[in-house]
């Protein structure tokens, strides 16, 4: 009985570890696409295994394509933004 109890406890812990690891890998492999107005400093960084940035608490971009667009209300010659389409881990 003692060995059976030890076996069951070990089996439960191993099952929880394997299930959580598989779920984590599946979550990382899911990719969502969003199109928003991001600045090149944000879009230029490649994502890593962490889903959320520790500083911004936003998803880290995996791949981004940015285009320079002039603002409608140009106040200076440098008044423009980068319109980026970013693919995120989510």
Swiss-Prot record:
GO terms for cellular component: extracellular region. Keywords: Antimicrobial, Disulfide bond, Fungicide, Plant defense, Secreted, Signal. This is Putative defensin-like protein 168. Pfam families: SCRL. Belongs to the DEFL family. Residues 1-27 form the signal peptide. Its main location: secreted. Disulfide bonds join 32-90, 43-66, 51-84, 64-86. GO terms for biological process: defense response to fungus; killing of cells of another organism; signal transduction. It is found in: Secreted.
